């Protein structure tokens, strides 16, 4: 049996994953970076430091879980944020360095891909599709909120940006509200827990989507005013989820109308939120009954290395 390893060292998570040659996940280790209480992020230098410290521990855990030596066939690594010539982020160099070292030592191939492509591959691996040559992908996270057109032959070959947020990303919106509510950072799962069972009392947050451009800075300012007036945190959290779901659903509908493509893959940390997923599904399905939305398991929506490993499997066999 041959194995394929993936690395992803993103803004807030160190990840390593291993797939066997059948595509079965045999190891998946992640460690969320530690952000100081009350902070709204961290410097790239701190990310690099924490990734450098985390990777040896995760590799030790991978080896311990596997139990016996394995034959690596290829390695995939997220080496830059997007598939653009000027796309660069120091944090990704940590994972790329480890991946290149392992590849050289084992005499195997290494496949570089963007962090966004890794999300797309993880989504396809988990959701079992889309299985079309052209599909839409929604990538909603703390670092990105984009709707893209993916056109492929045997693999993801070309990604065209259609639209997205022009200011704050959806995940940034969540995190900034989370910090204001004194939730741990990143705030996604904590805000989701706070909002649970409170959507009937969600505050109405005006959302702004014009064509394929959304804005979350205005909604964020509205939320801060509501908090200053003493609105219940639970109702605020529920309102944030609803605002994001409405905005993303409207972006998706606009992308469908522009391209005629009705298969949509939804990835990124924001897509791990159950209420947001369900609300998008309802609103998009109501607007266009021909659409097919593909959601990966919520475990594979946030940052992970499974997509990079799956990319290596696709390229290295």
Regions found by a protein language model. Give the residues of each.
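Conserved phosphate-binding catalytic cores of ATP/NTP-utilizing and phosphoryl-transfer enzymes
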Residues: 1-2, 108-136, 310-311
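Short glycine-rich phosphate-binding loop at a beta-alpha junction
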Residues: 69-80, 260-271, 294
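A short helix-loop
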Residues: 2, 6-10, 26-28, 131-133, ...
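Conserved phosphate-binding/catalytic loops in two-lobed NTP-binding clefts
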Residues: 264, 281-308
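Short beta-strand-loop/turn "lid" adjacent to the catalytic site in phosphate-handling enzymes
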Residues: 63-99
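A contiguous, well-structured pocket-lining segment that forms one wall/lid of small-molecule binding clefts
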Residues: 193-264, 270-285, 313-316
